[in-house]
Amino acid sequence: MHGLDDAQYLQQKAHNKRISEFRSSSNSGINVTVVLKYTNGVVQVYNWQGTEVIAGSLNRQLMKFPNYMNPDKHGRIEWPGEGVEHQHGLIRSNGGNGSYDIGAGDPYAMQFIVQGSVDWNATRLRFFGPDGSRWMPDDQGGASVRAGLLNAAEDIINSKMQPLYFCDRMAGKSYYVRFDDKYAPRFPTIGFEVYRYRVGATNEMGGESARTAVASLISFPTFSTAYVNEKVAVENFFQPRELVYQNSYGYTV
């Protein structure tokens, strides 16, 4: 016997089938560049390659991240993604109401640049806690988030997910993710997966999977890596005219 109830067994069997399909697909080999952009202009760049589809964790202690925030009198801070980009629709929030709010206490942003044969128009991110569960507490909308993460792509981020946001940029070629450091003591580890959604995806709880996994970052470099200058990082890792945004430091890529 497999030791699982029928529903668990079928779910695990379907999961194994998706992994097998993914590993034999043309999307199985990808490169991921992770850029940590601090609000003081410092950038850290990491690269990752792989084909494994394993729900790993970043194993980063969020409380170790310095908080460079300088909120204004309204408790807001400038963040890449506001202003010009928002007005021109280069960034689309999945908050449900078409907008998002950036609050004080945001320690850092992550930018994910994924390169490879991926369906960019249907790529999203999914977040996990240390034990593989959704990391939002129930009293902060965690139950809604756990349900929302099982829905189709457009329903993944709902307006209750204040501690994090992500957005599309330029047909999905990169992502900004913001974490609120007030949750750091309770949720010291964050794992994430990058998913490709099938066209016409429906609620996964209905039985048929709505997702095909593209990649999981199953390991992550330590943050002892030397900082790099933001301008150097931008010149090295962004293609002008492909990724266009104006950040809070005054120049446009």
Curated annotation (Swiss-Prot):
GO CC annotation, single: viral occlusion body
Keywords tagged on the record: Viral occlusion body
Protein function: Major component of the virus occlusion bodies, which are large proteinaceous structures (polyhedra), that protect the virus from the outside environment for extended periods until they are ingested by insect larvae.
Protein name: Polyhedrin
